[in-house]
């Protein structure tokens, strides 16, 4: 706000846009953000033309605080919680798919959540129905690598058919990015009509994940607590090898397939065959290294001998197995959220929220002080001091009385002059 020499005030906002100049006033309007349709933006309507405001330049105060809350605090909190929800739900659903439920069926997902979204900018070309011509779809490829951030995608001016992706949280630029490529745990697929020069999309991998997280498995009998297979050593084995662990690292392609692991020499060479004696895999056992096939990792302690056998067969009594349930418990110590455990990620999110709340409280106090000072200055310029006005009234009264006395004296003198002429 600038006071003019004629006591008029001119009001400017943002990076210099005019709200009030002399007798002219322009309206502050709220509109959809041109880059992100899920947010609102401010603009100044001058003669019917809306000029966007740079919210970073608005400063403090009620409007600045609300815009920062939307653009920074709320967006960051939503992304942090979405990152946490997507990482946890994806890991639980994946582990659920590795096991068998009480009916002996592979586990179905426990949770559902809204996946990544790509929002077109308002300036992108649209068809006659108002739908964007270009389209972009996203898919999660590694939930544990997802970042708590939105992204901006635009055509790469230096590489035709490729794109520039900017991570908005820290400004990290990925260039060039090809159709189908993965960035930070999600992949980008360009539709049949690619974005043209000047068009852009706001990518939101995790923003909606927490708000739409739902439990979709309501029957406890559907919890896949059992391992799909069990490993049994042949009682006639002569070596010292024993089964130390049977881990499931992926959903088995055929969880009901029986396999036999046979060692062909004392050096640890082995063959893995199915029930029909067809060779599935072969290799050499190394102490401390699991033997892996079809999503199954078998770890042994000790040394096998020639002719030793271990059979891996389907679980016949799922109700008596808790192997996969134990791995659900192990999820608590795994880095499921961008290198952090779920507990650490939640603690960091709450810590960041606390810092922001304290910063907002301090900013509010500072703004209140500035507002109080501005109010005092305004009162000093435009307010009424009763003592001063009373003194002025007395002065005016005395001046009036003196003027009246002068008029009375002049009237007397005039009358005297008239009488002399008679």
What are these regions (language model features)?
Residues 1-422:
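S/T-rich, low-complexity, solvent-exposed segments of bacterial secretion/appendage proteins
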């Amino acid at each position: 706000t600038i006071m003019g020499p004629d006591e008029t005030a001119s009001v400017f906002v943002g990076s210099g846009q005019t709200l009030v100049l002399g007798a002219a006033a322009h309206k502050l309007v709220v509109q959809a953000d041109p880059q992100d349709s899920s947010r609102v933006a401010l603009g100044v309507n001058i003669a019917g033309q809306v000029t966007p405001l740079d919210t970073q330049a608005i400063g403090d105060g009620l409007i600045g605080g609300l815009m920062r809350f939307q653009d920074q605090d709320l967006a960051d909190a939503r992304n942090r919680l979405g990152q946490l929800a997507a990482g946890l739900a994806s890991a639980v659903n994946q582990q659920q798919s590795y096991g068998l439920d009480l009916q002996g069926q592979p586990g179905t997902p426990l949770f559902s959540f809204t996946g990544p979204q790509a929002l077109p900018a308002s300036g992108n070309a649209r068809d006659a129905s108002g739908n964007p011509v270009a389209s972009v779809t996203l898919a999660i490829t590694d939930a544990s690598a997802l970042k708590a951030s939105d992204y901006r995608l635009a055509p790469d001016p230096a590489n035709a058919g490729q794109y520039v992706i900017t991570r908005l949280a820290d400004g990290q630029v990925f260039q060039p990015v090809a159709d189908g490529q993965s960035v930070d745990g999600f992949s980008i697929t360009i539709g049949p009509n690619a974005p043209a020069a000047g068009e852009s999309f706001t990518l939101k991998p995790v923003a909606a994940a927490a708000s739409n997280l739902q439990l979709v498995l309501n029957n406890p009998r559907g919890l896949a607590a059992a391992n799909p297979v069990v490993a049994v050593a042949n009682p006639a084995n002569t070596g010292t090898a024993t089964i130390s662990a049977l881990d499931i690292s992926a959903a088995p392609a055929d969880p009901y397939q029986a396999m036999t692991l046979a060692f062909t020499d004392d050096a640890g060479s082995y063959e893995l065959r199915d029930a029909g004696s067809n060779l599935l895999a072969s290799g050499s056992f190394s102490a401390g290294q699991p033997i892996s096939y079809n999503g199954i990792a078998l770890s042994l302690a000790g040394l096998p001998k020639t002719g030793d056998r271990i059979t891996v067969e389907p679980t016949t009594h799922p109700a008596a197995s808790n192997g996969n349930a134990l791995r659900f418990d192990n999820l608590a110590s795994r880095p499921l959220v961008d290198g952090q455990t779920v507990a650490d990620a939640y603690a960091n999110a709450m810590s960041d929220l606390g810092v922001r709340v304290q910063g907002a409280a301090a900013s509010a106090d500072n703004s209140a002080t500035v507002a109080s000072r501005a109010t005092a200055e305004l009162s000093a310029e435009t307010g009424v001091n009763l003592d001063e006005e009373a003194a002025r009234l007395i002065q005016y009264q005395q001046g009036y009385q003196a003027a009246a006395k002068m008029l009375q004296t002049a009237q007397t003198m005039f009358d005297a002059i008239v009488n002399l002429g008679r």
